[in-house]
């Protein structure tokens, strides 16, 4: 899937409609993973996983840390302990 990237946001639009998005605005130097959305037509295709991975790359690229508010992001990080060093302590 082709994602558009902005600071603190990665998303996909199809025919003018938002179909996938993760938001992780920076607060006090920490990326707050606060929302993940995938359109029902895309569920089960690994799109949310792709969004979190792209966000992780973006946060790592700027040397940041992450705080998890979004339940999907919490679950994703629990299943990917190799990324735990990114989490705010």
Predicted regions and their residues:
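Conserved beta-strand in the GNAT
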Residues: 17-25, 32
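Short loop/turn motifs at secondary-structure junctions and domain boundaries
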Residues: 2-3
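Conserved beta-hairpin
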Residues: 8-19
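A short, internal acetyl-CoA/4′-phosphopantetheine-binding micro-motif in the GNAT/acyltransferase core
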Residues: 36-43
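C-terminal structural segments of small proteins and small subunits
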Residues: 54-89
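Conserved acetyl-CoA-binding loop-helix of GNAT-fold acetyltransferases
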Residues: 44-56
């Amino acid at each position: 899937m082709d994602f558009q990237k902005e600071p603190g946001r990665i998303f996909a639009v199809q025919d003018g409609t938002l179909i996938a998005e993760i938001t992780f605005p920076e607060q006090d130097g920490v990326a707050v993973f606060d929302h993940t959305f995938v359109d029902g037509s895309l569920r089960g295709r690994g799109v949310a996983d792709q969004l979190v991975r792209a966000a992780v790359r973006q946060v790592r690229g700027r040397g940041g840390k992450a705080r998890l508010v979004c339940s999907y992001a919490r679950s994703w990080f629990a299943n990917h302990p190799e990324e735990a060093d990114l989490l705010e302590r």
